[in-house]
Structure formats: C-alpha cells, structure tokens
Amino acid sequence: DRSRGLGDVYKRQASDPDADRIGIAVRNDKGEFVLVNGNQIVMIFLNYLMTRNKELGLLKGNEYIVKTIVTTETIKTIAERNGFKMYDCYTGFKWIANVMRENEGKKNYIGGGEESYGFLCEDFVRDKDAVSACVILAEIAAWAKDQGLSLYQLLQKIYVEYGFSKEKGISVVKKGKSGAEEI
C-alpha cells in the first residue's frame, strides 16, 4: 500500500474532471483507507457547518439547509436537533438553487447537497462545487483533529449522536421516448 509512506495522512480527497463532485477516502480505526459515500459526505459537511456556525456565534435564527429527496433522512434529524430549517427538494442542484432563490434576502443559507457526491457550500454559487467543498473538507479535517478525531471517527460520532442508517443504491436505466415517459 503506497499510502503507508505518506506518514500522518489520514484522508484523501479528489474531484471529478469538471470539479462538481467530491470523493473522499479516510483511514478507519485499523489504518485502512475506506471510501466515504455521498450521503456520508453530506452528513459530515452539514453537521460541521451547523455546529461550527453555532460555535462561532454566527447564527441569526433564520438559517436553513437543503437536501434532495434521494439523500439520507439522517440530515433531517441533524437539522431538527440543531434548530435548523431543512428543505427537501427534487433531485438535482437546480432544485437546491431554486430553494436558495426563494429564500434570498429572507433566510441564511448554510449548505446543501445530495447523495451523488455533490455539495453546495456557498450561497453565491448555484451549482455543485467541488472546489469550495474541498476547501471546507480540509477545514473539517482540521477541526476534527483539534477535537482528537479523524474524519472516520467524526462520522462514527455523527452516527452515534443522530442514528445509524442503512442504504442501498439502485440504478435503473430507461431508454428512448417510452423510457423518458416512464420516468
């Protein structure tokens, strides 16, 4: 394993070529790299953004987050327990952007994402953005390390606090005009 020579590195992150999705591998408690799925990434991001904004006293009482209907319901639990409004919208970042547009000037956007490894962490961007997400992820890793946690341990802590979930992804392909009509 070439990663053994990287010393203290306990996470790897990358984006796809058009920089709109982020992937993460973290070391588990055995020191092995494991992939973090899209739902887990959104949980880590949104939990951090809500928690950190509270810690820094940046909340005005009108904050909200957005997830899509295909994204884990654990996000709803995290939002409710932290006193944040959560919007659940159709799949796709255009729908997250629509929620942002509807709340512009009225509420404070904290973050949004979906299980497809996309995340939107700034209100001045209206599509998934891996560049900003990579920066926030580095910030999350440093914040976790300050607490004596790896990202893997942070994820486990989130599960313990908000509940474990099981998921299974299914991909269905529909072809042609009849397929489009079925969708």
Task: Please provide the spans of the model-predicted regions.
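Single conserved hydrophobic/aromatic residue that forms the stacking wall/gate
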Residues: 1-10
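Phosphate-binding and adjacent anionic-ligand microenvironments
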Residues: 32, 52, 57-183
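Catalytic or ion-translocation cores adjacent to nucleophile or general acid/base/metal-coordination motifs
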Residues: 37-50
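Short Gly/Thr/Asp-enriched flexible loops that form oxyanion-binding sites at enzyme active sites
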Residues: 20-38, 75
